[in-house]
C-alpha cells in the first residue's frame, strides 16, 4: 500500500510500512466505547488545539494543545454580536492496516483561509492548519474508532472574533480552536435512501456567503431543518434564491446526480459551498470509474421529468447518502433507484472513495495524511 503525505507545500509518495507491536499497542489502547452504535453528537475528548491572533502583533501565535474545553470571552465579543465565525469539518479514521489518517486536510485549510478572508478575518496559514489537525488527532488517538466500526473521529476547526465590538465592524482579535469527537454516521441509516423535500426557504443569496463555510449560513438553515424533521423529511433541498428554478444544495451537503446517459452531474452555482468530498468524488468518477462529469446548472424541472436515475447527497459528514424520493410541495418525485437501496452508481462512488480513504485502494498523490 502506498500513501501520499503532504509536508508543508510538498507532497511525497512512500510505502506505508507495517507497525511494530509497540506502535500497534499504543494505537489499540482505545477508549471503552460502543463504537458501532455512536450517534452524531459531541463527546468531550482529551486535548484540543488553540491559537490566538492579536491585532497588535499582526500574526497568529504558534498555538498549543490544551486540556480545557471552556472558552472565556467578553459579553461583547465579535462572534456574539455579529456572528463573525467560520469553521471546517473533517475526519480522522483507522485504515485497514491500522494506521490513523486524515483525508485531504490541506483543502480544508485552504477553504477556511478563503472563508476567513470573506468575513474580514485574518486567515490562518494552511500549514499551521494542517499541523493543528495532526496534533489534535495524535493527542486523541485513543478516541479514533477502530477500523470496520463505521465510526470516525470528527474534527471541528473553527475561528471567531473574540475582542469586544459594539459598532458593526470586524473584531481586532481572533481565536482559533480544533476539537475532536468520535461520531457515528451523520444519517443513521448509513447508505439507505432518504426522503427529502423542496423547501421555500433560501439558504444563500446571490453574491452572498453561500460559497464559504460560515456559521451564519447554518444558523439560517436551522428553522428549515427542524420543520423538515417534524414533517418526516431527512433534509431540505434549497433552490437558487434568484429564480427558484435550479437546485443548489441541502443544509449540510452538496448534491450529486446521475443522468440517463450515466454521466455524473454536478449543480453549478456561485452560492454552493465547494465540497471537498464532492471534488474528490468527481475525481473518482473520472479516473476510477470512467464516468463523464458535467458541471452545470440543474433545473428542478429536469428531476420532475425523470432525467436522472440517481440522486445523492455528499459531504464530510454524510459521505454519500442516496435520495430515494423528493417531495415538492406535496407531490412525491420517486427516483428510479427507489427507497430500498442505494443506486449502482452512487454505490460505486461511495465504496470507491471509502476504499481510498481506508487504504484498500491506492490513493491519488496528496490525498492521505498519515498521523501514525
PLM regions with names:
Residues 50-60, 93-98, 105, 162, ...:
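Short acidic-glycine loop/turn motifs at beta-strand connectors
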Residues 1-25:
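N-terminal amphipathic/basic-hydrophobic helices that include classical n-h-c signal peptides
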Amino acid at each position: 500500500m502506498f500513501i501520499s503525505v503532504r509536508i508543508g507545500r510538498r507532497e511525497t509518495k512512500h510505502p506505508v510500512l507495517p507497525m511494530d507491536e509497540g506502535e500497534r499497542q499504543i494505537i489499540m489502547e482505545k477508549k471503552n466505547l460502543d463504537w458501532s452504535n455512536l450517534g452524531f453528537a459531541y463527546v468531550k475528548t482529551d486535548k484540543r488545539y488553540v491559537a490566538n491572533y492579536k491585532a497588535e502583533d499582526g500574526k497568529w501565535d504558534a498555538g498549543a494543545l490544551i486540556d480545557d474545553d471552556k472558552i472565556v470571552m467578553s459579553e461583547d465579543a465579535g462572534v456574539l454580536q455579529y456572528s463573525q465565525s467560520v469553521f471546517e469539518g473533517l475526519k480522522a479514521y483507522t485504515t485497514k492496516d491500522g494506521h490513523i489518517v486524515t483525508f485531504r486536510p490541506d483543502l480544508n485549510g485552504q477553504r477556511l483561509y478563503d472563508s476567513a478572508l470573506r468575513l474580514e478575518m485574518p486567515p490562518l496559514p494552511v500549514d499551521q492548519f494542517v499541523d493543528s489537525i495532526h496534533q489534535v488527532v495524535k493527542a486523541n488517538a485513543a478516541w479514533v474508532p477502530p477500523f470496520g466500526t463505521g465510526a470516525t473521529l470528527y474534527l471541528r476547526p473553527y475561528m471567531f472574533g473574540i475582542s469586544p465590538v459594539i459598532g458593526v465592524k470586524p473584531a481586532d482579535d481572533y481565536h482559533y480552536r480544533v476539537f475532536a469527537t468520535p461520531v457515528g454516521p451523520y444519517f443513521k441509516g448509513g447508505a439507505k435512501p432518504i426522503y427529502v423535500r423542496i423547501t421555500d426557504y433560501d439558504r444563500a443569496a446571490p453574491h452572498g456567503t453561500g460559497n464559504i463555510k460560515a456559521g451564519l449560513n447554518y444558523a439560517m438553515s436551522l428553522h428549515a431543518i427542524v420543520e423538515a424533521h417534524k414533517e418526516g423529511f431527512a433534509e431540505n433541498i434549497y433552490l437558487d434564491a434568484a429564480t427558484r428554478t435550479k437546485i443548489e444544495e441541502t443544509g449540510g451537503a452538496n448534491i450529486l446526480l446521475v443522468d440517463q446517459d450515466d454521466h455524473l452531474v454536478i449543480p453549478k452555482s456561485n452560492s454552493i459551498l465547494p465540497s471537498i468530498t464532492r471534488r474528490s468524488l468527481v475525481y473518482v468518477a473520472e479516473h476510477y470509474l470512467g464516468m463523464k462529469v458535467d458541471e452545470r446548472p440543474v433545473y428542478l424541472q429536469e428531476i420532475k421529468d425523470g432525467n436522472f436515475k440517481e440522486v445523492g447527497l455528499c459531504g464530510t459528514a454524510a459521505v454519500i447518502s442516496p435520495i430515494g424520493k423528493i417531495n415538492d410541495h406535496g407531490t412525491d418525485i420517486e427516483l428510479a433507484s427507489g427507497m430500498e437501496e442505494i443506486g449502482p452508481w452512487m454505490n460505486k462512488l461511495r465504496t470507491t472513495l471509502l476504499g481510498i480513504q481506508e487504504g484498500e485502494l491506492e490513493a491519488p498523490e496528496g490525498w492521505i495524511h498519515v498521523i501514525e
